[in-house]
Amino acid sequence: MIRHVDFFSAINPEDSNAIFDGLSILANIPHASLFEVTRNLKVDKINGKDPDFIVYAEFTNQEALDAYKAHPLYKKSISIVRPLRDMRIAADFLG
């Protein structure tokens, strides 16, 4: 299994709902066996620059992850979120 995690922050806090809605589009892509988009609770006060959103997904294999990233809804989500985001950090790991 491949676990995929993305962290995002908004340039402008007023765009938070638009970013959340744009990321939520990804839930309609059929290739993930588990998919979540959530807002960061920001309870850890050690970090100075916390992400605003987390995307977490699990895929059965690399082919499923590749198909997810090639899906038209993935591209639609990027077109909405990219202009509004400040930071994006992504990680893929075996689980």
Give residue ranges: language-model regions.
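Short S/T/G/P-rich N-terminal loop/turn motif that feeds into the first structured element of a domain
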Residues: M1-F53, T60-A70, L94-G95
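C-terminal structural segments of small proteins and small subunits
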Residues: E58-L94
